[in-house]
Amino acid sequence: MNELANPLELCGFEFIEFVSEDGQLDAVFETIGFSKVAKHKSKNAYLWRQGKINIILNYQPESYAAYFYKEHGPSACAMGFRTKNAAKAFKKAIEIGAEPIYNQIGPMELNIPAIKGIGGSPIFLVDCDIYQNDFIFFDDVASNPVGTGLYEIDHLTHNVYKGRMQYWADFYEKIFNFQEIRYFDIKGEYTGLTSKALTAPDGKIRIPLNEDSDKGNGQIAEFLNEFNGEGIQHIAFICDD
C-alpha cells in the first residue's frame, strides 16, 4: 500500500458529535457562531452548523453517548468520516482488523456503520446526506449559516497514555492508511510532550496524537486524569479571518 492509496475512500470530516447533560453545551456553540438548524426525528439530538462544519449534540438517554458521558463527562464522543461508499468502507475496515460498533436505531433511521476508535468512541462512516433522512430542519433558521466565519474542521487531537502513541498511529495507518506528516518533541521541565501529526490519504482529515514526555506529569496526564481515559482533546477550525 503506497502513501497515496485511500483504501476506505475517505473525503473529509462529516461531523463531530458531543454529549453532555441536556442543553449544557448549547451556549458554548452558540457563542462561537454555530446555529441549531435541525432536530433528530426520534432522538433528543440536534444538528448545529456553521460553514461546512457539522456538530451533533446528543442528549439521548440510554444511548452510547449517554454511557460515554457517564464515564467521561461533557465531551466529544464520536466523529464521522465522509467516504464514497460507507458499506464498502465498513466491510474493508473490518477485514483489515477494525472492531465494529453496532448502535440501536429507530424505525426508518439510517443504519450508519461505525468502528471503535479512540477511548472506545465510534468512528462513523458516512456516504450520503444523513441529515435529510434523520433530522427535521427548522423553518426559521438558515440550513447553512455563515456564523462568525468558521467554515471547516482543520484537525482534532487525541491525547493518549504514555507508550500508546505508536499504537494509535499504527491503528490509523492500518485501517485508513494515514501517514505521519510531522513529529514534535516539546521539551519542558514539567510539561514536555511528544506529538505525532497524522493525515488521511485525502489530506482533509488530520489527527495529531499527543503523549507526555518521560516524567509523565504534564498537560497530557492532566487531561487523561480529568477525562478518565484517552480521547479527543481539542478541535481546530479554519476561519476566514
Predicted regions and their residues:
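Short loop/beta submotifs within extracellular cysteine-rich repeat domains
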Residues: 36, 55-56, 206-207, 216-217
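Short, structured coil/loop segments at alpha-helix boundaries
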Residues: 62-65, 214-218
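A generic structured-segment signal
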Residues: 66-70, 224-225, 239
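Surface-exposed interaction/gating patches
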Residues: 12-19, 140-206, 212-217, 226-241
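Catalytic lobes of large eukaryotic enzymes
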Residues: 220-222
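An N-terminus-focused feature that recognizes amino-terminal "leader" regions
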Residues: 1-140, 155
